[in-house]
């Protein structure tokens, strides 16, 4: 717990240092209103990174979430375009996200194939479905489907207590997942499953049932992200979630999730999501192209994974270092 608290404190310090650094380059970065309301640009990274953290803790992975967002977004647009009531379209969008997640879990359960391979396949399946729906609706390219009610598009711009509503929603979701992962029996079962699946089976845990809950949560969170993004941009497009996978995965791993399973922190992921989001925002404000920002996110993920791997095998690293150093000393 102390180590986890220290890591989360380090992430908070890094977040503050990042804001101050970009603020020195562009003073607008230090404006409190800009800091608060710019979160609407990237808060969906955190919304999907939180359940993704749970999946990683369990020893799984889901790389189809970006396509799930696109499919849910365009499905919402098609239903709204057809004149369906908004409450029904939103409800069915959430249901679609849940079904996508459950379908991933079912494929993993019944085939026994690695989750990375399964979700890679469904990434293309859901992405293709989104493009098909988009084409059928006549929403090609970057046009998307518009015409949403003002009550829906206003959501992303509303405030509650002076805070943007999407940021408040993210805080509520963070608290929910924190309770789920760190303050209950389900969380203990989750960590045991990731650390030792065989022991989890011997303990009579629902080893096959837990992934359905986890991947279902990723699906629902992807649908929520789709709703927030459509409200924010005012149009539904099949490519809305295309660029969210890498930042979300980076946030989960940077936040403390072990890519091999068995450890992770919801609060760490939430802080890391803000860290990654403000990194992208700050780079844009100082004139760095989006391509460079994406490359830096990828590089950050590689560095974090390498660091985690070295920490897990630190004894081997130390032994190798001593062996190499002793050889050099003898040769001298």
Curated annotation (Swiss-Prot):
Keyword Chaperone: no
Membrane topology type: Multi-pass membrane protein
Domain of life from the UniProt record: Bacteria
Residues that span the membrane, as ranges: 5-25, 43-63, 83-103, 116-136, 160-180, 210-230, 259-279
Coiled-coil regions listed: none
Entry keywords, A to Z: Cell inner membrane, Cell membrane, Membrane, Transmembrane, Transmembrane helix, Transport
Keyword Transmembrane: yes
A single MF term (Gene Ontology): transmembrane transporter activity
Signal peptide stretch: none
Pfam families xrefs: BPD_transp_2 (PF02653)
Cell compartment(s), UniProt: Cell inner membrane
GO cellular component: plasma membrane
InterPro entries: ABC_transp_permease
Family matches, as PANTHER family: ABC TRANSPORTER PERMEASE PROTEIN YPHD-RELATED-RELATED (PTHR32196), AUTOINDUCER 2 IMPORT SYSTEM PERMEASE PROTEIN LSRD (PTHR32196:SF71)
Function, as annotated: Part of the ABC transporter complex LsrABCD involved in autoinducer 2 (AI-2) import. Probably responsible for the translocation of the substrate across the membrane.
Similarity section: Belongs to the binding-protein-dependent transport system permease family. AraH/RbsC subfamily.
Assembly mode: The complex is composed of two ATP-binding proteins (LsrA), two transmembrane proteins (LsrC and LsrD) and a solute-binding protein (LsrB).
Protein's name in the database: Autoinducer 2 import system permease protein LsrD
